[in-house]
Amino acid sequence: MEDCIEWTGGVNSKGYGRKWVNGKLVTPHRHIYEETYGPVPTGIVVMHICDNPRCYNIKHLTLGTPKDNSEDMVTKGRQAKGEELSKKLTESDVLAIRSSTLSHRSLGELYGVSQSTITRILQRKTWRHI
């Protein structure tokens, strides 16, 4: 396989590149895919066969469903669990978040994570094993 072409600009919290194109924040790997092959269909994601979120080498990109992407992560042993899921939170933090009466916003500020992260914890979409 050819070497990755790594994005050297800004990245998001998950390590994916990000850039502005026509007033919209996009990931470089999706942008290069769409520039090469056209729009990605709704409900489809651009996957990295190299498992490098900063890579935008068109030869390392393929389309799949979110389920395909999740199965690929599990097959390759890249699906984080527990405290590996977020370096910012521990299991005791999650238990405290679930028992708190503070707002999602306040909890996010307190623990240094997004409000949506707090929501996913409270809805047991993440940290389900606790």
Curated annotation (Swiss-Prot):
Residue stretches spanning the membrane: none
Pfam family, one: HNH_3
SUPFAM superfamilies: His-Me finger endonucleases
InterPro entries given in the database record: His-Me_finger_sf, HNH_nuc, Homing_endonuclease_His-Me
GO molecular function terms noted in the UniProt entry: endonuclease activity
Gene3D superfamilies: Homing Intron 3 (I-ppo) Encoded Endonuclease, Chain A (3.90.75.10)
Highest taxon above the source species: Viruses
Protein name from the UniProt record: Protein 7.7
Annotated source species: Escherichia phage T7 (Bacteriophage T7)
